[in-house]
């Protein structure tokens, strides 16, 4: 449903942000 799609989108954004942060730190 809508919530699942929203959570999925947020998860993807969070994952990309985490990867970016890790790359900058490392």
Swiss-Prot record:
Top-rank taxon, per record: Eukaryota
Subcellular location: Secreted
Main location: secreted
Pfam families, alphabetized: DD_K
Any one GO BP annotation for this protein: defense response to bacterium
CC per GO annotation: extracellular region
Similarity section: Belongs to the frog skin active peptide (FSAP) family. Dermaseptin subfamily.
Role summary: Has antimicrobial activity.
Name under which the protein is recorded: Dermaseptin-J1
UniProt lineage: Eukaryota, Metazoa, Chordata, Craniata, Vertebrata
